[in-house]
Amino acid sequence: MKNAKISRRSFLKAGAVASAVGMLSAAPVAAHAAETDASAAADEENGLLDVFKKPKYVFLFIGDGMGTAQIQSARFYKGTVDNNGAVTEADLSFTSFPQVGSVTTYDSTSFCPDSASTATSIATGHKTESGVINMCPWTRDVPYETIAEKLHAQKGYKVGVISTVNIDHATPAAFYAHQKTRKNYYEIGVELANSGFEYFAGGEFQKVNGDGTGPDNHTVAANAGYNVVTTQAGAAALTAGAGKTLIIAENLGDGKAMNYAMDAANGEWQLTDYVKKGIELLNNKKGFFMMTESGKIDWACHANDAAASIHDVLEMSNAVQAAVDFYNAHPNETLILVTADHETGGMAIGYKTTNYDTFLTNLTHQKMSYAKFDSTYVQGYIANKTPFEAAMADVKTHFGLTLPTDPDAASAGKLLLTDYEVANLRTAYERTLEVG
């Protein structure tokens, strides 16, 4: 497919598409852009943004699965916790951006799309089928060129792709790969190496060894001229001029992705650190494009883990702040877009069973994600046939939920389980031990 020349109109259209994406109906959009003096004056007069300078530095942040409820739950949680339980809404780094909106996110065949098709829409402006990455939905043999590829080839921009999940996962892959199915993980990794993009950072390749007959994805990248860095110390030591770089996070959690923000150890690099390193490595006179995905918001919501979702949204806010800091140093040359590819889980903030209350401060008692609890404790319970009461002692430690028979029951407050809840938990636990 021939490269279409980037005009000012098409670039801004691509920017609008990049801000437009969510799983059931709409996703939030926020943008912070370079303005000319004329547009600033127009803004002041009539509230409209009429004229942009062409952005030299473009940041695109995608909260995978991050609908309005995910954003608001993080704002409410932070506001409540920071104000001793008072009903207070906190600002995030991107919630006060001057341009805000929402968009529908259906793909070519479904109102409930996945990350492959929605990320394709963001990256190329084309709709396709769920599961397909940057290929036409009818024959799956016509590739779509991505905005990252256009900027890299036609404008000489350096390009960075960052994700808290696997670097070959659907969303990051949609900026450099073209595959009939998102499950072609090894082939996606090969396309990463062939992209020539200057900076990649995230979790491990999902099928790093392919079918075992060829070089692993690390070797493929190294053979293509990439510095393949797998330690945090090695990443920290990188400086401008390091050349093409692929960083695989040293500390990996479930699914060989980066750890949830709430599970990260003290000093462990999180999304913000990789954004800052990306800025350091990509910054140049021609410009750069950086796509950053907070991918485990989606994973948390698939697991109905509200606390993990909240903490990953807050960490994404920190990462966006790093871009805002860069914007403040380059206000007339920088565009920041913050959006989602789709919403996940149909999150609601309060409902009938909670009497439309939220109990957000209860989440402060959760000390680890559901996924980490499962891998750290539940697998051992299954192997050892741990008694229910012993397992619930760990639940109390890491989530605060307390049995009525516990010595601390009188002081457990709203975290005291009812007999009905205990019966349901016991049944579910026994079923877990039975089926593994």
Model-derived segments and their meaning:
Residues 55-57, 66-72, 76-120, 169-436:
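A post-motif C-terminal structural segment
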Residues 26-56:
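C-terminal segment of N-terminal export signals and the immediately downstream linker at the start
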Residues 127-190:
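Extracytoplasmic mature domains of secreted/periplasmic and thylakoid-lumen proteins
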Residues 53-70, 75, 139-154:
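Active-site-adjacent structural elements in enzyme catalytic domains
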Residues 60-61, 161, 338:
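Structural beta-sheet core signal
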Residues 47-48, 62, 68, 72, ...:
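Alpha/propeptide regions of enzymes that mature by internal proteolysis
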Residues 1-10, 14-26, 32:
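N-terminal secretory signal peptides
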Residues 110, 114-138:
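A glycine- and small-residue-enriched flexible loop/hinge segment at structural boundaries
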